[in-house]
From Swiss-Prot:
Subcellular location: Cytoplasm
Keyword match Repressor: no
Organism phylogeny: Bacteria, Bacillati, Actinomycetota, Actinomycetes, Micrococcales
Protein name, as recorded: Bifunctional protein GlmU
Gene3D superfamilies: Hexapeptide repeat proteins, Spore Coat Polysaccharide Biosynthesis Protein SpsA, Chain A
Ranges where the record places region Linker: 253-273
Region of interest (N-acetyltransferase), residue spans: 274-497
Organism: Micrococcus luteus (strain ATCC 4698 / DSM 20030 / JCM 1464 / CCM 169 / CCUG 5858 / IAM 1056 / NBRC 3333 / NCIMB 9278 / NCTC 2665 / VKM Ac-2230) (Micrococcus lysodeikticus)
């Protein structure tokens, strides 16, 4: 076996299927697992080969699918993409023929054909397919897998030299066994994945000649293998030990199975890199997430999108982070965060909701039952419990009391609250934006801050407490409160109020 270093001239990704068994208004290849659509995974694997050209063949919901593919290609840095349209002639042979037509007419070298609904195919396997194909001078190289149950798959039939003689479809193997009593073809467990490396010149010669004179009325790509052998070309194979690499998603159950397998692969990778995953069965990490060594993921953790978690951080239990950055040694528990930045040594949760634009500085804290949005919180600042901070800036080492909120919305526009450094706010303070509180200022419990507070000042609302002694026994006689008050020596005065 050769080293996987060859670069193909082109990769053709077949993405024209409708996917009716998904029973969805979303095209099959746009369904997602592990943070990417099915076709996104296929394009990423294809582009890992660094081909000169990459073609996606589309048909069903053409405009929507093509736009999605172009968006994914831009995200992956693919700069050699072409979109080809499949016409009314059905079959994989026709799809590849139209994909080939989108490539330069004088293209030489290796053309890889793969599928847009096979998300677990690895770059390493594709590279090995190309390398062996070119090193051995094959006309066609088939990617195969060996299954416990090969029902429904085309069987790999080999000649005396061990090369691929032909691919026998399952129904043909059954028919042969029924008519001859020979079930040797049915017993074959090595199957065709539908993924190939071809010589480009061979495809140009043979694809136009493929007939639709068959039961399905389709142009079968597998016919190229027989044509190659008729020309004296070598048809060989490369096998994968992981059968999940060649599994497609045709319905929701298969989509779920593939998602679970992909997640297991992702978690195994990160555990090898020094990440502790306490319970892999309840932990989900997208392929786009970045983790550092000595990160700990506790049960119920979900990490999505461009989330990154730095060394020594602990996430979970029961936390969902999307496009969120977590700093070194930070602790995030029972938190839902989207597009947030959590500084080193910071603490979040439990039961915390960080909305887009939340930036928590180093050593900061956002505690239980807090919601934040578009807020920058300085180093060492604390928002410990029961509050809302939105459209705000909070300075370093400020302590925000229990039940504080920034009243940022006047019914039409959002307004900003600025709270300085080393501020101390009393419980249930309301900041009616726009308002600024200077460094070192205090607010009293229950204060409604409607005007700017200078540095070092105390802001409180001057409402004196009024106490009506004996009110409960007089006004709520017969209640348990009245009985308790009388037992404590209170007398009902009949005071008004």
């Amino acid at each position: 076996m050769s080293q996987p270093s060859a670069r193909p001239s082109a990769v053709i990704v077949l993405a024209a299927g409708q996917g009716t068994r998904m029973k969805s208004t979303t095209p099959k290849i746009m369904h997602a697992i592990g943070g990417r659509s099915l076709v996104g995974h296929a394009l990423a694997a294809a582009w890992s080969l660094a081909p000169e050209h990459l073609v996606a063949v589309v048909r069903h919901e053409r405009a929507r699918v093509a736009e999605h593919i172009e968006t994914v290609a831009a995200q992956l840095g693919i700069d050699a993409l072409a979109i080809a349209d499949q016409d009314d002639v059905p079959g994989t042979g026709r799809a590849v023929e139209l994909g080939l037509a989108a490539l330069p007419a004088d293209l030489e070298g290796t053309v890889v054909v793969t599928y847009g609904d096979v998300p677990l195919l690895t770059p390493e396997t594709l590279a090995r397919l190309v390398a062996d194909h070119e090193a051995d001078g094959n006309a066609v190289t088939v990617l195969t897998a060996t299954l416990e149950d090969a029902t429904g798959y085309g069987r790999i039939v080999r000649d005396a030299e061990g090369l691929v003689e032909r691919i026998m479809e399952h129904k043909d193997a059954l028919a042969h066994a029924e008519s001859t009593g020979d079930d040797s073809f049915v017993a074959i467990r090595e199957v065709n994945s539908g993924i190939y490396a071809f010589d480009a010149a061979l495809l140009r010669r043979t694809l136009p000649a493929i007939s639709t004179d068959n039961v399905q009325g389709e142009k079968y790509l597998t016919d190229v293998l027989g044509m190659a052998r008729d020309e004296g070309g070598r048809v060989a194979s490369v096998g994968t030990q992981d059968v999940w690499e060649v599994e497609g998603a045709n319905d929701r159950r298969q989509l779920s199975d593939l998602g679970r397998r992909l997640n297991e692969r992702v978690l195994r990778h990160w555990m090898k890199e020094g990440v502790t995953v306490v319970d892999p069965s309840s932990t989900w990490v997208d392929v786009t997430v970045t983790l550092s060594s000595d990160v700990t993921l506790k049960p119920g953790t979900q990490l999505h999108g461009a989330t990154s978690v730095a060394t020594g951080a602990v996430v979970g239990p029961d936390s969902t982070l999307t496009d969120t950055q977590v700093g070194e040694r930070a602790v995030v528990k029972r938190t839902d965060a989207t597009e947030a930045v959590i500084g080193a040594d910071a603490s979040i949760g439990p039961f915390t909701y960080l909305r887009p634009g939340t930036v928590l500085g180093e050593e900061g804290r956002i505690g239980a039952f807090y919601e934040t949005k578009k807020v920058t919180i300085g180093r060492g600042a604390k928002l410990s419990h029961l509050g809302y901070a939105g459209d705000a800036e909070i300075g370093e080492y400020t302590n925000i009391g229990c039940g504080n909120i920034t009243a940022n919305y006047d019914g039409v526009n959002k307004h900003r609250t600025v709270i300085g450094a080393h501020v101390r706010t009393g419980s249930n303070t309301v900041f009616t934006a726009p308002v600024t509180v200077g460094d070192g200022a205090y607010t009293g419990a229950g204060a409604v801050v409607r005007e700017d507070v200078p540095a070092g000042a105390l802001a409180l609302n001057a409402v004196s407490q009024r106490t009506l002694e004996g009110w409960v026994p007089a006004k709520r006689p017969g209640t348990s409160s009245a009985e308790a008050a009388r037992a404590a020596g209170a007398e009902g005065s009949g005071a008004q109020g």
